Amino acid sequence: MKKKTWKRCVCMIGVVLFAVTGLNANNRVPDSPIKKTRSNTFIIEKEKAWEPAGEGVARQIMGYDGQVMLVKVKFEKGAIGTPHTHYHTQTTYVVSGKFEFTVGDEKKIVEAGDGIYIEPDILHGCVCLEPGILVDCFAPMRADFLK
């Protein structure tokens, strides 16, 4: 990945994390085991295995606590992010590749440098048009990803 693209990606992730955690400040996870759950402080990519997440899709969980989770998702060309809903707020940053995203009734082609905001409980999914990587940020964390 080009140095300039990587810097832009890291900057965007910081903005996304700030925005998501700030927007959900009044919706804190109640005192529960999830609230006390957290990842290691440093997650080193080459030390973290990719987990299967569907045909042609794999993910790495890159950090989390009860309030927020950062996930890197790798897609092969033609892979489908099956349409689904969840109660989490989601923001997605396109690191590389090209995707056709559907969010609610809207459909748009997105590519490196683009972002997507997905409200809770909105049907969304994607088709990978060119191999790529997405970075998803969820608030609160996706406890179902830890099982």
Segment roles from a protein language model:
Residues 2-11:
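Bacterial N-terminal signal peptides that target proteins for export
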Residues 11-21:
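Bacterial N-terminal signal peptides
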Residues 23-67, 147:
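A short, N-terminal "cap"/entry segment at the start of jelly-roll beta-barrel domains
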Residues 54, 69-85:
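Conserved short histidine dyad/triad with adjacent acidic residue
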Residues 74-76, 85-101:
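Short, conserved beta-strand element in jelly-roll/cupin
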Residues 95-96, 111-112, 130:
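A cytosolic small-molecule/anion-sensing beta-strand core signal
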Residues 106-120:
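Short acidic-glycine-tyrosine-enriched beta hairpin
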Residues 120-144:
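Ligand-binding loop in jelly-roll beta-barrel domains
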